[in-house]
Amino acid sequence: MTGPVVVVGAGHNGLVAACYLAQAGRDVVVVEQLDRPGGGSRTEETIPGYRFDLHSAAHNIINMTDIPAELDLAGAGLDYIEMDPFSVAVHADGRRVRFFRSIEQTVDSIAESSPAEAQAYRRFMDKSLPIVRTVMPAIRGDTLTRALPRQVANLARALRHDPLATARDAISPYDSLLRRWLPSDLTRGPVAAFAAHAGVGPTVPGGALFAFWQAAYHLFGQWHGRGGAQNLTNALVTRLTALGGQVRCSAPVERIDAPGGTVRAVVLKGGERIGTSSVITAINPQTALLRLLDPPLAGSAGADLAAARRSNVVQALVHVATDRLPAYPHSRPGDWNGLQSYVDRLDDLTTSWTRSEAGLLPDPLPLYAFTPSALDGSLAPPSHHTVYLACPAAPSRVEGGWPARRDELVEAALATMERRAPGFRSTIQGVSPWTPDDMDQAGGWPGGHPMHLDIALDQLGPFRPTRQLGRWRTPIDGLYISGAGTNPSGGIAGTPGRQAARALLADQTK
């Protein structure tokens, strides 16, 4: 092997990959175009005195894996606080549904408004749990030998009642699935809001998986990193440094030299050349293989990657600093611990998604909030709070451009908050929008797409980003891919990073 292994991109997947390589004794250098590591797991003072996550505000998938334990991230400072209830539906008509880690507590909460709906939700979870348990080994990156016995048992449980109906449910859009299983928008709306959080629209075939995924929050919970999502990044950098690895920020890549189909070097903008025979990219795979790779990936592998889909629907954020928590009528202690959903109707979410796909601002604005300062006082001045507002169906490219439309986004978000929490405007100390343009330019995500590519049945698991590239290897000798656009999926998981590192290490020991 020539030179260090170069990891391109210091998001959490790139850092996870680097840690596993360094743990195996490899010399590793991570190069990052931004001035600090973290990617989607960054926390910054976007309003003076108030620290906000720039994208990921709650972590769950990584806590379903062995990655934190295998890298001893707790020993490097990783500290998670559970968010329970993980979600509260704040309906405009005053009804509340609290989704706790405990299914029984959740059923009791739903029963306060509708005993029939509560039992329907229980049946939906009975259906969802074995399906989630079946797909979990792939999400965790378990080996086939370890996973197969559990997968067979869970699949049998999932299919024991009417297997054809289960197959139909699995390939359905979650709009259809939720209408079959849940009787009203009391629970359909908030469950759909969580499914939309994955970046999947209500009418996308196969999107049902992300409504079934509601069961995963009951199984594993939802977690806030103390001090924000940056806590995970800091722990990974600490562990990597302790293992002898190196992170270089403000080091954008000009190209990856691979003459004759073999990696030779990573060349930084400015001309510095890092000689290497091994590279893992942890950025958008289309950027890595079609723009940075020199020569670009060709043949059917390149054509398939170029055809991978990226829709016009992404996420937009509004950070709001306040001097108190949102004053929801009929609130109870704990209502600010997790996600607070303002999606009242499944139809509204579908309408908003359609408008955003067409480049229009969504109307009505689908919105949810996190108030992490309710759990973590380090994020705001004493007695003050951080309110993180997220629209899961914002247009990447909007009619008129985001510079001209950002104020409309802010006004729509604040108006929604005022309706749900009367008097909210009077508590505001500062506002900072974070549009798809900002995520593109300051976050390094083309089009503001944190998942890099759409989440869809044909772009998930071993088909992500494409079938030919779904095992983290490329046709270029020494070049591997990782990140949200690779197998198995996006989100704060770390699995793509670990699996890419394992692929490289396995190939080098052959």
Where are these regions (language model features)?
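Mid-domain catalytic core of redox enzymes
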Residues: 252-380
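N-terminal glycine-rich phosphate/pyrophosphate-binding loop and immediately adjacent elements
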Residues: 3-140
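Rossmann-like flavin
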Residues: 92-205
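A conserved FAD-binding loop/helix module that cradles the flavin
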Residues: 56, 484-505
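Helical element adjacent to the flavin cofactor pocket in flavoenzyme catalytic cores
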Residues: 213-263
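Helix-loop-beta segment of a Rossmann-like dinucleotide-binding subdomain
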Residues: 152-165, 201-235
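A glycine-rich dinucleotide-binding beta-alpha-beta segment and adjacent secondary-structure elements
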Residues: 184-198, 362-370, 423-487
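Flavin-binding catalytic cores
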Residues: 114, 325-326, 359-364, 402-441
